[in-house]
Swiss-Prot record:
Plays a role in rod outer segment (ROS) morphogenesis. May play a role with PRPH2 in the maintenance of the structure of ROS curved disks. Plays a role in the organization of the ROS and maintenance of ROS disk diameter. Involved in the maintenance of the retina outer nuclear layer. It comes from the Eukaryota. It is a multi-pass membrane protein. The lineage of its organism: Eukaryota, Metazoa, Chordata, Craniata, Vertebrata. This is Rod outer segment membrane protein 1.
Length: 351
């Protein structure tokens, strides 16, 4: 049975392979650490921005999967550092001979699987952010006025912090505030004629104005911020509603958050792809180094050539061997007679 992808490794190539694996393993550990930082940062961002995502959004699964993949990649890199360093010293390598094989299997199945899952999520989930942000922001703006309603008391504070931090206003622009009641009914005077007319003129009984909250104001603007009666050209003679308003944030929060979260997901996906490549190289190199050293009894500087390989035989032969071994293991052992006891003899009847 011929081995799969054999590679002849003389003395110097074996040493260079071990040294190269030591460097690649450190790079893999570093990449795993960077993935941990990136996924942790994305988790923190989603903890603050989760209010503005739809409850059915699956995007938070991405940093969780990436966190697990980064931890496994970091562990695989550290194992590679230890194994490659020990392989250069015949006195340090024997403890690794029994555990390196199972570690390679675990790193290939667990680490590789997690990286593939994380990379797939990084490519698929950002596309669902558009609808999730749209639904979440509609709900957040609708509850802006509910400062005394249980479950929505923090909506105003969260929306104000969002608009001030990300320099945005409304969902797609400041005019989105014209279609929602953002002033709490507690601060409205039902006896005021203007208030009563606005409420009665709305089908849903909402108090709608052509104004925006204070958090939409741009503090860097040299002019006073215009918050009220923005659609009335007579109220502000120098303000043209058809021109961009320099006093208010120009972008909507939907566009800003979508770009921000997609950039974070893109960075995380790139790191997962690089880590997958590094982990594949490290695991392949460790496998060749392990099988080469097994042929030399674990001594890397032994004279002569040795052969490294991925599998000792083809897939068909491996399955056949495993089947035969399993059949032997499952076959019941023959019962043995106790020592000192002769098997009973059958009585022969006389003819």
């Amino acid at each position: 049975m011929a081995p799969v992808l054999p590679l002849v490794l003389p003395l110097q190539p074996r040493i260079r392979l071990a040294q190269g694996l030591w460097l690649l393993s450190w790079l893999l550990a570093l990449a795993g650490g960077v993935i941990l930082l990136c996924s942790g940062h994305l988790l923190v961002q989603l903890r603050h921005l989760g209010t503005f995502l739809a409850p059915s959004c699956q995007f938070p699964v991405l940093p969780q999967a990436a966190l697990a993949a980064g931890a496994v990649a970091l562990g695989t890199g550290l194992v590679g550092v230890g194994a490659s360093r020990a392989s250069l010293n015949a006195a340090l390598y024997p403890p690794w001979r029994g555990v390196l094989g199972p570690l390679l299997v675990a790193g290939t199945a667990g680490g590789g699987g997690l990286l593939v899952v994380g990379l797939g999520l990084a490519l698929a989930l950002p596309g669902s952010l558009d609808e999730a942000l749209e639904e979440g922001l509609v709900t957040a703006l609708a509850h802006y006025k509910d400062t005394e309603v249980p479950g929505h008391c923090q909506a105003k504070r969260l929306v104000d912090e969002l608009q001030l931090r990300y320099h945005c206003c409304g969902r797609h622009g400041y005019k989105d505030w014209f279609g929602v009641q953002w002033v709490s009914s507690r601060y409205l005077d039902p006896g005021d004629r203007d208030v009563a007319d606005r409420i009665q003129s709305n089908v849903e009984g909402l108090y709608l104005t052509d104004g925006v909250p204070f958090s939409c104001c741009n503090p860097h603007s040299p002019r006073p911020c215009l918050q009220n009666r923005l659609s009335d050209s007579y109220a502000h003679p120098l303000f043209d509603p058809r021109q961009p308003n320099q006093n208010l944030w120009a972008q909507g929060c939907h566009e800003v958050l979508l770009e921000h979260l997609q950039d974070l997901a893109g960075t995380l996906g790139s790191m997962l792809a690089v880590t997958f490549l590094l982990q594949a190289l490290v695991l392949l190199g460790l496998r060749y180094l392990q099988t080469a050293l097994e042929g030399l009894g674990g001594v890397i500087d032994a004279g002569g050539e040795t052969q490294g390989y991925l599998f000792p035989s083809g897939l068909k032969d491996m399955l056949k061997t495993a089947w035969l071994q399993g059949g032997v293991a499952c076959r019941p052992a023959p019962e043995e007679a106790p020592p000192g006891e002769a098997p009973p003899k059958e009585d022969l009847s006389e003819a």
